[in-house]
From Swiss-Prot:
A Pfam family that the UniProt record links to this protein: AAA_5
Domain of life: Bacteria
Name used for this protein in its record: Uncharacterized protein YehL
Example of a GO MF term: ATP binding
Species name: Escherichia coli (strain K12)
InterPro entries: AAA+_ATPase, ATPase_dyneun-rel_AAA, CbbQ/NirQ/NorQ/GpvN, P-loop_NTPase
Amino acid sequence: MSPQNNHLQRPPAAVLYADELAKLKQNDNAPCPPGWQLSLPAARAFILGDEAQNISRKVVISPSAVERMLVTLATGRGLMLVGEPGTAKSLLSELLATAISGDAGLTIQGGASTTEDQIKYGWNYALLINHGPSTEALVPAPLYQGMRDGKIVRFEEITRTPLEVQDCLLGMLSDRVMTGPELTGEASQLYAREGFNIIATANTRDRGVNEMSAALKRRFDFETVFPIMDFAQELELVASASARLLAHSGIPHKVPDAVLELLVRTFRDLRANGEKKTSMDTLTAIMSTAEAVNVAHAVGVRAWFLANRAGEPADLVECIAGTIVKDNEEDRARLRRYFEQRVATHKEAHWQAYYQARHRLP
């Protein structure tokens, strides 16, 4: 990463992994789908890693799922990533777009206030009034740019967008053409170039907010992104991701392994309560891996900037409550019961230090 990008809070994948992308492109001898920057094997290696080429693994997911996603996009079908919040759907869509187009910047953030002109195109009203509708007065939105340049467009949280706005995608996904009725001649129709496609994401917890129409669903292939099931894999991911964030924050210490074990085990225990309906109460909070990474980062920041040391179990207690409790007071009591019924039963020193710090819970 170049020095001018060192001060970015979150560099895009194309910047963060520029060296890896260049290496993969240089060594890529496999055939590429039209409009793609990398072949399918090279794109798979970029996402899942390749020790032989010194390419890092960027997300924990089954290789078969990544292959299905790449094949879907290579056929021209839209890709819909669905799953619980915090399962790296957005990261996965960014990595896919970066591998295919070399850029993941054409992003639409869905929400209740999202309008059609934020998706397709708007107008520079000064030019529109002076010169009338023209390509010079047109302000291209991500979908217009993606079709014009042959790039992947990402649509985040599509189910949070009003239904009538979602359906503006129908023509682009089926006929690969965008019509501008205000324009005349050839400019009134924009035909998608090779390489254009759409990757959308949707949280299962938003189901029913703005349900997608059957017509729009038919134009996507759906792929469910599941939480990480293996404890060791989740622990490794939280450790590596939090270490990267702490280094970016200028902190010389990583979160100790014992504290990370407490964090990941707590998240998995509380997540299992919600899934398996055990004797413990169900939590309303989303105990995702992404949230665990944020807590680990907070533990390191708190320990270093407040006490000039590495993180300890007491720091974890201080940082974990805000993630688990949110705005639900009942979850506060459930978290306390977890400490009394689960944490107290562990005899290891770091678990006992964790339990002894329970008075720090708000």
